[in-house]
């Protein structure tokens, strides 16, 4: 039995991954990558079998953000030529939900740019979500920025299932990425979501000039935060942002990162998120031996892979999509 399968068995028995073991994952020799992914899949299969959860993003409000996040094309300091618009109307949100439902995508993510939502924007989301739940029964995730307790309660009462607010990077590296809000601001929003009964979703961006120790620290911080769903983004450097031209990643390292997140957060939904197409490239299928969830379609301001290609990839792997009906049943079981 190789060292990664031994570690996987210890993790399944309840052991915590040490920093030394975590570093060994990130330093795994490239020629041993299949052994590492086999260990990660041993854990993934224990909790999720061969099921894959599908998610779709609706960019409900674009640009116009006062924050100074260095990776983001929508920030106040970005010069990227993106489309900017205020919160879309209810009909547009419903059209997106119908598309997700028709494509058998179980989770619909409503994402809005900005520091945090106004009460009016919360009103708009609440109004749409109530009809989305009645008509399509999708799992709804909201990602609206820094959240107040009363706003979180309104979202929960309307039927929102999950709230996303990424920590993005380690506490140590956070001020290198943005200074317009703190790491603790982000943690606080996730805690507010949890306290309101929303399922917490929080993840990371890899490739933003962090160290390997930063990657380990963010994976462990998300474990401590007990995030149910962990999106792992890989930087897609956009021209006009401070991180323009940064390209520190390669496909094999991205696989090691996904394996690390699975070993540290064994039972959680690990989602391959933004940047998978440009960073994992032809090795995208291997990522699903560690992760059990992907975004389908376009991201916020960058294009994703065609939905049909994602379905072909999953079929070729012998994996099974968690259907909308299966997702509905799992939500009913939790309620």
Curated annotation (Swiss-Prot):
Domain Radical SAM core per the UniProt entry, residue ranges: 47-276
Disulfide bridge partners, by residue number: none
EC numbers for this chain: 2.8.1.6
InterPro entries listed in its UniProt record: Aldolase_TIM, BATS_dom, Biotin_synth/BioAB, Biotin_synthase, Elp3/MiaA/NifB-like_rSAM, rSAM
Keywords per UniProt: 2Fe-2S, 4Fe-4S, Biotin biosynthesis, Iron, Iron-sulfur, Metal-binding, S-adenosyl-L-methionine, Transferase
Residues annotated for [2Fe-2S] cluster binding in this entry: 109, 141, 201, 271
Gene Ontology BP terms: biotin biosynthetic process
EC category name: transferase
Domain of life: Bacteria
Keyword Isomerase: no
SMART domains: BATS (SM00876), Elp3 (SM00729)
Pathway(s) served: Cofactor biosynthesis; biotin biosynthesis; biotin from 7,8-diaminononanoate: step 2/2
MF terms in GO: 2 iron, 2 sulfur cluster binding; 4 iron, 4 sulfur cluster binding; biotin synthase activity; iron ion binding
Binding site for [4Fe-4S] cluster: 65, 69, 72
Catalytic activity: (4R,5S)-dethiobiotin + (sulfur carrier)-SH + 2 reduced [2Fe-2S]-[ferredoxin] + 2 S-adenosyl-L-methionine = (sulfur carrier)-H + biotin + 2 5'-deoxyadenosine + 2 L-methionine + 2 oxidized [2Fe-2S]-[ferredoxin]
Cofactor note: Binds 1 [4Fe-4S] cluster. The cluster is coordinated with 3 cysteines and an exchangeable S-adenosyl-L-methionine.
HAMAP family in the cross-refs: BioB (MF_01694)
Subunit structure: Homodimer.
Job description of the protein: Catalyzes the conversion of dethiobiotin (DTB) to biotin by the insertion of a sulfur atom into dethiobiotin via a radical-based mechanism.
Family, similarity comment: Belongs to the radical SAM superfamily. Biotin synthase family.
Protein name: Biotin synthase
């Amino acid at each position: 039995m190789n060292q990664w399968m031994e570690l996987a068995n210890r993790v399944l028995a309840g052991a915590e991954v040490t920093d030394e073991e975590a570093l060994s994952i990130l330093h795994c020799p490239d020629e041993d990558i299949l052994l590492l992914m086999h260990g990660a899949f041993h854990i993934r299969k224990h909790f999720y079998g061969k099921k894959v959860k599908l998610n779709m993003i609706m960019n409900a409000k674009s640009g116009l953000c006062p924050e100074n996040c260095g990776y983001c094309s929508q920030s106040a300091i970005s010069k990227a030529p993106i489309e900017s618009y205020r919160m879309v109307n209810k009909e547009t949100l419903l059209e997106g939900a119908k598309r997700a439902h028709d494509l058998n995508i179980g989770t619909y993510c409503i994402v809005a740019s900005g520091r945090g939502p106004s009460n009016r924007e919360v009103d708009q989301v609440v109004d749409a979500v109530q009809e989305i739940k009645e008509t399509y029964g999708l799992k709804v995730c909201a990602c609206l920025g820094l959240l107040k307790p009363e706003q979180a309660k309104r979202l929960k009462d309307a039927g929102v299932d999950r709230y996303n607010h990424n920590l993005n990077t380690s506490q140590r590296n956070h001020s290198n990425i943005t200074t317009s809000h703190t790491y603790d601001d982000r943690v606080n929003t996730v805690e507010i979501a949890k306290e309101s009964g929303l399922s917490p979703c929080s993840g990371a961006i890899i490739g933003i000039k962090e160290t390997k120790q930063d990657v380990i620290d963010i994976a462990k911080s998300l474990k401590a935060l007990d995030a149910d769903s962990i999106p792992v983004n890989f930087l897609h450097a956009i021209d006009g942002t401070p991180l323009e031209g940064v390209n520190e990643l390669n496909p094999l390292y991205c696989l090691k990162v996904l394996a690390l997140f699975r070993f540290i957060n064994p039972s959680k939904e690990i989602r391959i998120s933004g940047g998978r197409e440009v960073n994992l490239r032809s090795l995208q299928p291997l990522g699903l031996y560690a992760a059990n969830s992907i975004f389908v379609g376009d991201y916020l301001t960058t294009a994703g892979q065609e939905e049909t290609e994602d379905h072909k990839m999953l079929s070729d792997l012998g994996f099974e999509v968690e259907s909308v009906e299966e997702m509905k049943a799992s939500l009913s079981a939790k309620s």
